[in-house]
């Protein structure tokens, strides 16, 4: 199961007593600010959680799996996430949930 923005909003509504509208707006504003920073080429550092970085990938050769034809994979910029030490430690020490 995945955590959704709707579930985050619901959690803020329940725990902080925000209205549902304010909770949803807070979640949207948070992600919009992360998105804006990355679009502007900035690193996003969330203390105790991790860092979102941008990485430029060079053009490289590829192959069409259907035809076997050689095709170039264009250069692009990708977002990477590196978890912080606190997050890594908590995940490693968490007991697995049954699905």
UniProtKB/Swiss-Prot annotation:
Disulfide bonds: none
Transmembrane segments: none
NCBIfam families: himA, PRK00285.1
The keyword Transcription regulation is assigned to this record: yes
Region (Disordered): 51-71
A GO cellular component annotation in the UniProt record: cytosol
Job of this protein: This protein is one of the two subunits of integration host factor, a specific DNA-binding protein that functions in genetic recombination as well as in transcriptional and translational control.
Quaternary structure, from the entry: Heterodimer of an alpha and a beta chain.
CDD domains associated with the record: IHF_A (cd13835)
Record-stated family: Belongs to the bacterial histone-like protein family.
Pfam family, one: Bac_DNA_binding
GO BP field: DNA recombination; positive regulation of metabolic process; regulation of DNA-templated transcription; regulation of translation
A GO molecular-function descriptor: structural constituent of chromatin
UniProt keyword terms in alphabetical order: DNA recombination, DNA-binding, Transcription, Transcription regulation, Translation regulation
The protein's name: Integration host factor subunit alpha
Lineage top rank: taxon: Bacteria
InterPro entries per UniProt: Hist_DNA-bd (IPR000119), Histone-like_DNA-bd_CS (IPR020816), IHF-like_DNA-bd_dom_sf (IPR010992), IHF_alpha (IPR005684)
């Amino acid at each position: 199961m995945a955590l959704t923005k709707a579930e985050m909003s619901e959690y803020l509504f329940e725990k902080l007593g925000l209205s549902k509208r304010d909770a949803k707006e807070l979640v949207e504003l948070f992600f919009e600010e992360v998105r804006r920073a990355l679009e502007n080429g900035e690193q996003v550092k969330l203390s105790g959680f991790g860092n979102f970085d941008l990485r430029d990938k060079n053009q490289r050769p590829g192959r069409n799996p259907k035809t076997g034809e050689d095709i170039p994979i264009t250069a692009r910029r990708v977002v990477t996430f590196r978890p912080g030490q606190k997050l890594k430690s908590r995940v490693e020490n968490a007991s697995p949930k049954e699905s």
